[in-house]
From Swiss-Prot:
Family stated for the protein in its record: Belongs to the TrbL/VirB6 family.
Biased composition annotated in UniProt, kind: Basic and acidic residues: 628-646
Single Gene Ontology BP annotation: protein secretion by the type IV secretion system
Membrane topology term: Multi-pass membrane protein
InterPro entries the record matches: Conjugal_tfr_TrbL/VirB6 (IPR007688)
Protein name: Uncharacterized protein RP105
Pfam families referenced in this protein's UniProt entry, alphabetically: TrbL
Length: 672
C-alpha cells in the first residue's frame, strides 16, 4: 500500500511538472529573435521584460509557417487559473499591453510604464513577428518563420534629405542634457547631404505625377562642367598670347601660370579620377576634402579652446579622449548644455546613480572632500515640495517659487532676470554659430564660380570678397565664444566661488555620459558653503523649506538665508545686466575684428527675449491704465455734458467780450 501511495504521488508530481512546464515556457519564440551585440535591450529595458512574458510554444499555440497570423500566449497574473491567455493577430494588427493583459496584472497591464506600449504584427525578412518600439527602433518580441520567402524590396528612406545624426546624434554626447551639439551635427550632415553628396530621394514619386527638381549636387556638377570649359578657353588664350607675344614666354610666367592653374582646378572643379570609391572613379576636390573641413572645424576648435579655459574648477569639463573620431566638437556644446542644466537645477545631472544601477562609475577630478555635498536623498524632509523629487525637473524655478510664496518677490524677479539673460546670450551664440556654418557651406557650394576669378585681374576682387567671408565665418564664432567664456567665468565665480566638482564617468554599451558632484575644497571651505550655488543645492535637496497655512491651504516656502541669497543673487544679476548691454554689440565687434559680414540681422538677438518681456510688461501696464480710465469715466456719466456746458459758457463769454471790444472800438472811432 505504501508503495502504491508513493507511486501515485510521484505520478501526480510528474504530471503537474509537465503541465507547468508546458505552460510556463515564457520567453520562447517559434524562431530565434535577433539579439543586440551588447545585450542591453534584452537585459535592462522593458523590451526584455515583455519577451519573458510571452510564450509561443504553448500547446495551444501555432507555429505553422503556412498561416499568415501569429499566435502567442500572454502571461497572466500569478495565481490565475491559466498561466497565460492565447491571442491570434494578423499582419498589421496592433494591441496595447493593457488590451492583452486584462486581469489587472500589476507587472503588465496595470503597470503605468508598460500598459501604453503598442505591439504590432509586422514582417522582418522571412519572419512574421510581434514587434514593439525601442530606443533602437522597432524590435521583435516573438517571431515565427514563413514558408514563402518575401521578395527583397529596397527600404524606402522616408527622411532622405535629413542626416541620420538628427535621430542618433545624442549617442555621441557625454552630457545627459544635449540639444545644441545635436543641432549642429544634424545641420552639418543635412547640409552636406543636400549640397554635395546628394539625397537618396527618388526622382519621381510612384503615387504622384510630380517630378522633383534636380538636386543641388547635380546642379553643381553641371556648373563644374561649365567652369571646366571656361578654364580650357583660358588656357587656350594664354597659349595664343605666349605664341604671339614673347613676354608671355618667360619661365617665371609659365611656372606661375601652371601653379595657379593647378590650384584653381583642384579647388574648384577637382582633379580626377584620382580616387576610386566602390570600384568607380571619383574626382578629388580640394575644397571638399580640405577647405570645407578646415573652415567648419576651425570654428569649434577655436571656440572650444577659449571656452574650456574658463569656468569653475571641474564643472562640465568632459574627457575629450572618450569622444569618437569625428565627434570631438561635441565637447564645446556639451559644456554649454551641461551648464544650462546645472544653473537651472536639472535633477538628472546630479547624483543620478545613487543606487548603482548604471554600472560602476569612474571618478575623475579633485582630491578634496570625498563626501557628496549636499546629500540629495535625506531622510525626514517631509516639507520639501514634491516637484523637487521629479526626474528631469528644473528645480531652480521651484526654489524661486518657494521664495515667492514666502513674500520675497525681489529674489523671484532677480532669479527670472538672470535665467532669461543667460539663456538669451547662449541662444545667440548657438544661432550665430549655425548661421556661420550655413554661410560656409553656401560659400563652398558656389566656390567653383569664385575660385577661378583669382586668375583675372578684373575679377580678383570678387575672389577676395568670397575668401574674406569664408575666413570671417570661421573666426567669428571663436570671438563670440570668448565673450561667452568670460560670461561663464564670471557666473561660475559668482555662483559657486571656490567650490570644486568631481566628475563621474558612466559607460553602458556605446552610450557614455558624465555627471558632476560638488565638493568642498581643502582650503577655505567656508567660502564655498556661503556661495549662492551651494545654498541652492541645499534647497534642491529639501533643506530650508517650511510648510504653513495660507488662509485654508498648506503651502511650502523658503525662509532661511534669505538675506545672503538676495545679496549673492543681486551680484549675479549685476553681471547679467552688464553682459546684457555688452551683448548688443558683440556681433558687430566680431564682424569688425574679422573684417567680415555682420550676422546680427539673421541670428537670434541676445536681447530678444528680454525685449519681449519688456513689451509684455508695457502692454499689461497700458491695459491696466486703460481699464482704470474706463472705470473712472463710468463713475461720472455727466462729465461729457458738463464739459459741453462749460465749453458753451466759454464761447458765450468770448462772444460777449468780443462784442464789448467791438463797441469800444466803434466808440473810440466815433470820438475821433
Amino acid at each position: 500500500m505504501k508503495t502504491l501511495k508513493v507511486l501515485k504521488i510521484f505520478i501526480i508530481v510528474y504530471i503537474s511538472s509537465v503541465s507547468l512546464e508546458s505552460f510556463a515556457g515564457f520567453g520562447e519564440s517559434c524562431s530565434n529573435l535577433p539579439i543586440t551585440s551588447d545585450g542591453y535591450l534584452e537585459t535592462y529595458t522593458a523590451y526584455g521584460y515583455i519577451i519573458r512574458s510571452i510564450d509561443m510554444k504553448d500547446p495551444r499555440g501555432n507555429c505553422n509557417p503556412s498561416t499568415s497570423s501569429i499566435t502567442f500566449c500572454f502571461k497572466n497574473v500569478e495565481g490565475s487559473a491559466s498561466p497565460c491567455t492565447i491571442y491570434t493577430l494578423n499582419e498589421g494588427d496592433t494591441r496595447k499591453i493593457s488590451d492583452l493583459s486584462t486581469d489587472n496584472n500589476p507587472d503588465l497591464g496595470a503597470n503605468t510604464v508598460l500598459k501604453n506600449i503598442v505591439l504590432t504584427v509586422k514582417k522582418f525578412g522571412n519572419d512574421l513577428c510581434l514587434a514593439m518600439p525601442t530606443s533602437r527602433g522597432p524590435m521583435p518580441v516573438a517571431c515565427k518563420s514563413l514558408s514563402v520567402t518575401p521578395t527583397a524590396t529596397k527600404p524606402k528612406d522616408e527622411n532622405c534629405n535629413i542626416g541620420k545624426s538628427c535621430y542618433t546624434g545624442a549617442n555621441y554626447s557625454q552630457s545627459l542634457i544635449n540639444f545644441s551639439g545635436l543641432a549642429v551635427q544634424c545641420l552639418s550632415e543635412t547640409l552636406n547631404k543636400i549640397f554635395f553628396t546628394g539625397s537618396s530621394c527618388s526622382a519621381q514619386d510612384q503615387n504622384s505625377r510630380i517630378t522633383h527638381l534636380a538636386s543641388f549636387a547635380t546642379f553643381q556638377g553641371y556648373l563644374k562642367r561649365i567652369i571646366g570649359a571656361a578654364l580650357i578657353l583660358y588656357t587656350m588664350f594664354f597659349a595664343f598670347n605666349m605664341a604671339l607675344n614673347k613676354e608671355y614666354a618667360t619661365t617665371e610666367k609659365i611656372t606661375l601660370f601652371i601653379i595657379k592653374f593647378l590650384f584653381v582646378v583642384y579647388f574648384s572643379i577637382g582633379l580626377g579620377p584620382l580616387d576610386f570609391s566602390g570600384g568607380q572613379p571619383v574626382k578629388e576636390n580640394g575644397m571638399l576634402k580640405y577647405g570645407l573641413p578646415l573652415l567648419t572645424g576651425a570654428a569649434p576648435d577655436f571656440a572650444g579652446m577659449i571656452f574650456n579655459a574658463a569656468g569653475s574648477r571641474g564643472l562640465c569639463q568632459f574627457d575629450n579622449t572618450k569622444y569618437k573620431d569625428g565627434y570631438k566638437f561635441y565637447g564645446l556644446w556639451d559644456a554649454i548644455d551641461c551648464r544650462i542644466g546645472y544653473y537651472l537645477g536639472l535633477d538628472l545631472l546630479y547624483n543620478i546613480d545613487k543606487n548603482g544601477i548604471l554600472g560602476r562609475p569612474v571618478s575623475n577630478g579633485t582630491s578634496g572632500n570625498n563626501k557628496p555635498i549636499p546629500n540629495f536623498d535625506p531622510d525626514g524632509k517631509k516639507d520639501r515640495p514634491h516637484d523637487l523629487s521629479k526626474a528631469g525637473a528644473l528645480r531652480f524655478f521651484t526654489v524661486m517659487f518657494g521664495f515667492f510664496m514666502s513674500g520675497h518677490v525681489i529674489i523671484l524677479v532677480a532669479g527670472m532676470v538672470f535665467s532669461v539673460i543667460f539663456l538669451s546670450i547662449l541662444l545667440y551664440f548657438i544661432t550665430h554659430y549655425l548661421v556661420c556654418m550655413v554661410t560656409i557651406y553656401v560659400m563652398t557650394y558656389i566656390s567653383p564660380i569664385f575660385i577661378p576669378m583669382v586668375l583675372f585681374t578684373r575679377t580678383k576682387a570678387y575672389f577676395d570678397g568670397w575668401l574674406k567671408v569664408c575666413i570671417s565665418c570661421a573666426l567669428q564664432p571663436a570671438v563670440v565664444a570668448g565673450f561667452i567664456a568670460l560670461l561663464i567665468t564670471m557666473y561660475d565665480s559668482a555662483i559657486f566661488k571656490n567650490c570644486e566638482f568631481l566628475r563621474y564617468d558612466y559607460e553602458k554599451g556605446d552610450i557614455r555620459f558624465s555627471t558632476f558632484e560638488l565638493r568642498l575644497p581643502s582650503i577655505d571651505a567656508d567660502k564655498c558653503q556661503e556661495s549662492f550655488g551651494y545654498k541652492m543645492l541645499k534647497y534642491y535637496a529639501g533643506e530650508g523649506w517650511e510648510e504653513h497655512l495660507l488662509i485654508l491651504f498648506p503651502i511650502k516656502s523658503i525662509v532661511r538665508d534669505v538675506v545672503s541669497i538676495l545679496a549673492e543673487l543681486l551680484c549675479v544679476l549685476i553681471f547679467s545686466v552688464i553682459f546684457y548691454y555688452f551683448s548688443k554689440s558683440i556681433g558687430r565687434f566680431a564682424a569688425d575684428l574679422t573684417n567680415g559680414p555682420n550676422m546680427d540681422a539673421v541670428t537670434a538677438s541676445p536681447t530678444k527675449i528680454v525685449d519681449l518681456v519688456k513689451k509684455g510688461a508695457a502692454f499689461l501696464k497700458d491695459a491696466s491704465v486703460h481699464e482704470h480710465g474706463k472705470s473712472s469715466l463710468g463713475d461720472k456719466p455727466d462729465i461729457g455734458n458738463k464739459r459741453k456746458d462749460g465749453a458753451q459758457q466759454g464761447e458765450d463769454a468770448v462772444n460777449s467780450s468780443g462784442g464789448e471790444v467791438a463797441d469800444l472800438a466803434s466808440g473810440s472811432g466815433g470820438g475821433k
